[in-house]
Amino acid sequence: MDEKRIKRKNTFKVIRSVLETLIILAVVLWGLWSLVEYRRQSRVMTDSLPVTCVMIPSDEIVFGYESAGKAQGEHFIAISYNGITENPRVGGKIVTKASLEKQIEALKASGYQTITQQDVINFYRNNDPLPDRALLLILEDGIMYSAELAQPELVKNNYIATVCTFAQNMSDAHGLYITAEEAKMLNQTSYWETGSNGYRLSYINVFDRFENYFGHLNTAEFLDIHNYLRRDYNHYLMDFLRDENRLRTESVSEMEERIAWDYEKMNEIYQDELGYVPGLYILMHSNTGAFGNDPLVSMKNAEMMEKYFSLNFNRQGTCLNMLDSSIYDLSRLQSRQYFSTNHLMMRIWDDTGHRVMFRLGDERKAADWERRSGVAEYTEEGIILTSMPYGQAKIRLLRELPKNLDLTVRLQGNMVGQQALILRADDNGENGITVRLHDNVLYLEEGAGEQPLLELDLLQFDGGPFFSKAQEEYNGKLALAYTIIANDTDEDRIRAAEAELEQLQGAVVPGIADGAEPFVPELDIDDEDDRILRIRLEGTSISCWLDGVQIADGQRVGAGSGNNLFLEAEVTRGSERFSQTNLSDDVYDGIFNCLNITDLEGKSLYSLAPIPVSEDAGGFLTAAMDWIVRLFHGINNNVFFRMEQERFARESKP
C-alpha cells in the first residue's frame, strides 16, 4: 500500500472518528435534554399530589348493587400472586412490586389479617375460629426473586405469606427457583412458610391452535411455544399421556404409577431437604371440576394428595372459602399484571360482600370529577376507572367545556373491554359524541350510537394481519423444533426434531400476498393496549388522530345536547372472553392517562398530566444506544441468530 493511500486512509479514519464523536455528543445532549424536560413535566404532574393516598369505603361505591357472593358465617379469603417483578413491561401474569405495595395497602386498610396454613387446617378439622377478615396470602411462582421483592411489604404490614416451591428444584443452586436452603432461610423469619406446586412444571398432550400435536414439553419448551397455543394442553398430573389422535398411550396402572411416582418423589425430596412436607399444595392446573381431566386420574390425585398434603387449592378465580368447602378443593383469586388496586378490591367485594376500601388517590384531582358509577383512582399520570362487576364505571368532569376544543389522551386499558370519552353530552352522559375503544376496534358515534360514523379495526390500523394462517402454523412448528433441539434431553426426540427442522427449512409457505387466508389472533383478556388519541371539535366537524395518524378529517357531527365530558369503562358482556389460562374477569379497568384539553388556539382548559417527552424520545434514544453498541463492538446488522433467519418475525410489520 503506497504512502498516499495510507495517508488518505488515516485521514478518513480521523474524519470518521470526529463524526462519531459528534454523533455521540448529540445523543448525550438529547438524552440530557429529555431527562431535564421529563423531570420538569414530572414536577408539573407531582406538584398537586397529596402526601398520602386517600382511601374510601365501598359503601357509597356499591350502593344499589348486589355482590355475587356473600361471606356468611366462618370463612377466609385467599389471594395469590403468580410472581413479582420490578419491570412494568414484563406483562402477562406477573404483578409489579409497585402494584403489590398498593394492593397490600388496600387489603390492610380493609381490615384483612393474614393467617397461616395451620390456621386453615384447624379451621376445617377442629372448627377453630378465624379472624373476622382472615386472609391467606400465597406467592405461587416459586422464584426466589419474587419472594425478595415481596418481603418488605410483609414486614411493613406484619403479614405472613406462603411461598410455593417445586420439589425438583430444591437442590438446584444455579436456577431461579427456591432451593431448600433458601426455603429454610425464609421460614426462619416470621413472614414466610413453605407450600408446594408439586414435583415438576411440565406439560403433556400439547396441541397448537391448528390441532398439530406438539407432544409433551418441559418448562423451557413450553415457554418458547406457548404463544402458538390456545387451551389445548395439560399439566403433567392432570390426564393420561395421549398421542396425536388423543388416544391413551398408557394403561390405567401405568398412569397410576406415573402419578404416584411424582408424589412419592416429592415426599422423599422434601423430607430429605426440609425435614417435612409442606402442608399447602396447589395442584396444577386449576378449574378442572375435579382433580384432573379424567375421572380415573382425578381419583389417583385425590388419593395421593390426601396422603401427603393437608390442604389443596384446586380452583382459581374466586377468593372466598367457607367452612363447608372441602379443604382439598379450596379457591384463590390470583391478582394479574393488569389488575389495578381497585380491580382487586372490586373482585373481593363481589366474592364476599365485605365492606372494603377503594383507592381514591389524589383527592385534589378527584375534586374535579363527579362519580356516576364504578370507582376511579386519580394517579400521578391520570385516571384508572374500574367498572362494577359485569357493569360500567362513569365519571363527569365538573367544569363546562366549550363546544370547540382540542383533546389528547393516552388510553392504556386492556384490549378486551370498553373505554370511552363522551363529549358535548347532556348531564346524564347521553346524546353526545363518543369515541370508544371496544375489543380492539375504535368507534366514533353520535347520539345513541346505533350507526357509528367511523368503525376502525385496530389490527388493520397497525398494518395487520401480518401473517397467513399457513405462516403462523409454520412458525409454531419451527419454534417447536428449535426448542426441542435446544432444551430436550431425549436423544431420539432431538434427532426427530432435527429431521423435522430440515424438512421445514425447505418448505415454501404461502403468505397473505399469495392469497392465503390471513391469521387474526384471538384477543385474550390479558392483552394490553396503549394508544394516544387526539380529538378536535370545531363547529359541526370532528377530526381525530390515533397514534399520530389522522383517522377522521372534518367528519360532520351535531352540536350535541350539552357541554359535558364523561369518561366510561365497561366490561365486555355477552359471552366469556378467551383466556389461555381458562379464566374470566367480570371487572374492567379503563385507563385514561395524560388527559389534556385546550381551546382551538391552544389555551389550556384542563390538564391531568402531559405525555412525558421521554415517551416520545425513548425510541430514538434506544435506537441510538443500539447503534453505539454496534459501533464499538463491530456488530454487523446483517448477522442474526440462525433461528431468526428461518422463521417469520412475529412482532415486525411489513
Per-region residue spans from a language model:
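N-terminal Lys/Arg-rich, disordered targeting/topogenic segments
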Residues: 1-15
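N-terminal pre-catalytic segment of deacetylase/amide-hydrolase enzymes
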Residues: 32-134, 328, 332-337, 533, ...
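Metal-dependent polysaccharide deacetylase catalytic core of the NodB/CE4 family, i.e.
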Residues: 82-87, 91, 134-135, 155-288, ...
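His/Asp/Glu-enriched short active-site or ligand-binding loop at hydrolase and phosphoryl-transfer sites
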Residues: 165-166, 221, 273-338
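Low-complexity, Ser/Thr/Pro/Gly-rich disordered linker/stalk regions
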Residues: 340-405, 603-654
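Secretory/extracellular carbohydrate-interaction modules
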Residues: 386-499, 620, 640
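Carbohydrate-binding surfaces in secreted/extracellular proteins
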Residues: 409-411, 475-515, 521-561
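Flexible glycan-contacting loops in extracellular carbohydrate-active proteins
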Residues: 554-601
